């Protein structure tokens, strides 16, 4: 009986809610979601080609495929300019800025670029190319997975994948990074240093650095050991520019990180996340995941979201 009770307690502690409803075009990879200021329409941007765009009247859908932000690819000269990754879109003074990465799998020959639009619609974007954040085999970081935030009045860009982890650099404006040396925010010392997809979110006097840890794809070829697949993790900081720690006080630079969402039931490898305050469901974390009932290939990935609550100052999937 005692063993049964203990197992039940563990199951309850590790239980996650199923993803929220999604209708229409629900494929997504490294999704980024933003609401248009003029009418509240939701736009979802995803990795692939010139960046996939979908729109919907609500986070639940129905999502409609609109095409690509940059149908002819980017003007950047590093990586694969016709297959752009991990878009991150923000609104500043009447203009939407879409940061994206150009690279190839397993390489540090990478760069981050930016495009602008006033409407968010497909084929309305003007590409400005590289912002000055580029990496190579001689840099400790990989210049992919951009994420923009303003701390106080200063804009910053978070980025990084594997190698020495996640970094942050100050921006001179929305189109270009400063020449300052990027600051290391988080590092995973274990295995092949699987850490990427940073997303920094301010709430309740803290800056929450969410990121994805674990194997992101290739599940149809070989599944990683249980628990080594993608999952969403968090550390927090008072300043947003360093000293990130997890719930147990472990530094994010020392492999720290508290799990927010991991595989469960039919959900496998959730990650590539972001956070948005919705009109009907409050603050939600959104992400892509492989649905075991559909398939484990990248082309089968699904858009997921869950409501977030905060317990003792830490985000919890409701």
Swiss-Prot record:
One GO CC term, this protein: extracellular region
Keywords: Carbohydrate metabolism, Glycoprotein, Glycosidase, Hydrolase, Polysaccharide degradation, Secreted, Signal, Xylan degradation
Site, Important for catalytic activity, responsible for pKa modulation of the active site Glu and correct orientation of both the proton donor and substrate: residue positions: 145
Key word Plastid present: no
Residues spanning the signal sequence: 1-28
GO biological process, one term: arabinan catabolic process
Positions of the catalytic residues: 30, 196
Location in the cell: Secreted
Positions glycosylated per UniProt: 72, 80, 188, 277
Class of enzymatic activity (EC top level): hydrolase
A GO term for molecular function: arabinan endo-1,5-alpha-L-arabinosidase activity
One Pfam family linked to the record: Glyco_hydro_43
EC number: 3.2.1.99
Keyword Cell inner membrane attached: no
Catalytic activity: Endohydrolysis of (1->5)-alpha-arabinofuranosidic linkages in (1->5)-arabinans
Main subcellular location: secreted
Pathway involvement of the protein, from the record: Glycan metabolism; L-arabinan degradation
Family: Belongs to the glycosyl hydrolase 43 family.
PANTHER family found in the cross-reference section: ARABINAN ENDO-1,5-ALPHA-L-ARABINOSIDASE, ARABINAN ENDO-1,5-ALPHA-L-ARABINOSIDASE C
Cited function: Endo-1,5-alpha-L-arabinanase involved in degradation of pectin. Its preferred substrate is linear 1,5-alpha-L-arabinan.
Protein name (record): Probable arabinan endo-1,5-alpha-L-arabinosidase C
Source organism per UniProt: Aspergillus niger (strain ATCC MYA-4892 / CBS 513.88 / FGSC A1513)
Lineage start: Eukaryota, Fungi, Dikarya, Ascomycota, Pezizomycotina
């Amino acid at each position: 009986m005692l063993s049964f009770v203990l197992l039940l307690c563990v199951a309850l502690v590790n239980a996650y809610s199923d993803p929220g409803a999604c209708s229409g075009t629900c494929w997504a990879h490294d999704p980024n979601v933003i609401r248009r200021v003029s009418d509240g329409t939701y736009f979802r941007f995803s990795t692939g080609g010139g960046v996939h765009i979908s729109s919907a009247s609500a986070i639940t859908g129905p999502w409609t495929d609109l095409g690509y932000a940059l149908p002819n690819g980017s003007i950047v000269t590093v990586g694969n300019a016709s297959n752009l990754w991990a878009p991150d879109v923000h609104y500043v003074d009447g203009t939407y800025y879409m940061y994206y990465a150009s690279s190839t799998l397993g390489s540090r020959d990478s760069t981050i670029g930016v495009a602008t639009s006033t409407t968010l619609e497909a084929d309305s974007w003007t590409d400005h190319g590289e912002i000055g954040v580029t990496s190579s085999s001689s840099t400790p970081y990989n210049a992919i997975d951009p994420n923009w935030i303003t701390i106080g009045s200063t804009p910053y860009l978070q980025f990084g994948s594997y190698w020495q982890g996640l970094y942050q650099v100050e921006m001179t404006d929305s189109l270009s990074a400063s020449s300052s040396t990027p600051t290391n925010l988080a590092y995973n010392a274990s295995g092949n240093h699987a850490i990427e997809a940073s997303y920094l979110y301010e709430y309740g006097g803290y800056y929450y650095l969410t990121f994805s840890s674990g194997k992101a794809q290739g599940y149809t070829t070989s599944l990683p050991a249980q628990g080594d697949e993608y999952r969403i993790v968090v550390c927090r900081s008072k300043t947003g520019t360093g000293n990130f720690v997890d719930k147990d006080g472990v530094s994010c630079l020392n492999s720290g990180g508290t799990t927010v969402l991991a595989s469960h039931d039919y959900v496998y490898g959730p990650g590539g996340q972001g956070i948005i305050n919705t009109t009907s469901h409050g603050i939600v974390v959104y992400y892509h995941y492989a649905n075991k009932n559909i398939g484990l290939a990248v082309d089968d990935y699904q858009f997921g979201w869950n409501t977030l609550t905060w317990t003792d100052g830490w985000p919890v999937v409701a």
